[in-house]
């Protein structure tokens, strides 16, 4: 008996590394030292920083992976993985510096895994960060054949005196919602229950435009890193930012705001995408649960002074991203402890 008989194909692993090499190295910034193959990735801090802070984040893609694996949508979940991590760390105004990935699988499929890593590499390229290293663990008997899980790790850098942490947010500031591409990577345990209930398949269509349901659900997470970079380069004064993930607006927007302030949202200020209405109707999901599970069309929020709204909307337009003023910041009432108002209770 040998290792391959036990379920681990070392030769397939080597072929996989060679397949992804060019995609990975194409993400490398000038600060990267060396290439693939070392025990650890090496990178210098960007030149010219005085008091740099490192910002780290980690995340996965959740049970969206099951749907993606059923429909061989491997490239897209690579983009999702980067989006989930990068969109978190940029909320502090940090520049994504490098990314690491971890892939665990039952049996290594070089083609599927290469598509995943190529998606990760493309997400890193769009976000300006180096794919500095990763681990692909073949674990036969632990994961079913063809099944895999993903984890991502992103490190970003920001000057200490330029960090955005919500301290500048004040009453009267406006909240800009930036469009999501769909469900992104949260709420898929509920999505999968709805799909099972309705017996939906790859041929199922929905909405006025008769869109393919599964393809729409698997649309990759929007990457907001370039938008934030452009806003910072344009010297737009950003007071706070929030990545709208699990928990939706109610649980994520207040995270960027001081506790003595309340965010007030007007749900009529943007049009809820048809996909969420289909999910609600098909699954008979209560309105409260819908808001606390999905982004409902708003994937990222920017908190800015009122006079900066026009500039923010212009930069979003130049990035081909829809955006809307969706609310404002007010003084909180000490007696209620409310952090967010305006949404259905």
Swiss-Prot record:
Protein family per UniProt: Belongs to the AIR synthase family.
Enzyme superclass (EC): ligase
**Keyword entries, A-Z:** ATP-binding, Cytoplasm, Ligase, Nucleotide-binding, Purine biosynthesis
Q: Which Gene3D superfamilies match?
A: PurM-like C-terminal domain, PurM-like, N-terminal domain
The scientific name of the source species is Prochlorococcus marinus (strain MIT 9303)
- The reaction(s) this protein catalyses: 2-formamido-N(1)-(5-O-phospho-beta-D-ribosyl)acetamidine + ATP = 5-amino-1-(5-phospho-beta-D-ribosyl)imidazole + ADP + phosphate + H(+)
**Protein localization:** Cytoplasm
Kindly list the GO molecular function terms attached to this UniProt entry: ATP binding; phosphoribosylamine-glycine ligase activity; phosphoribosylformylglycinamidine cyclo-ligase activity
Q: Which EC numbers characterise this protein's activity in its record? A: 6.3.3.1
What are the disulphide bonds in this sequence? none
Q: In its keyword annotation, does this UniProt entry include Cytoplasm?
A: yes
* Protein's UniProt keywords contain GTP-binding: no
CC per GO annotation: cytosol
Its annotated pathway reads:
Purine metabolism; IMP biosynthesis via de novo pathway; 5-amino-1-(5-phospho-D-ribosyl)imidazole from N(2)-formyl-N(1)-(5-phospho-D-ribosyl)glycinamide: step 2/2
- Enumerate the Pfam families for this protein: AIRS, AIRS_C
Which GO terms fall under biological process for this protein? 'de novo' IMP biosynthetic process; adenine biosynthetic process
- Major location, coarse class? cytoplasm
Q: Which domain of life is it from?
A: Bacteria
Q: What is this protein called?
A: Phosphoribosylformylglycinamidine cyclo-ligase
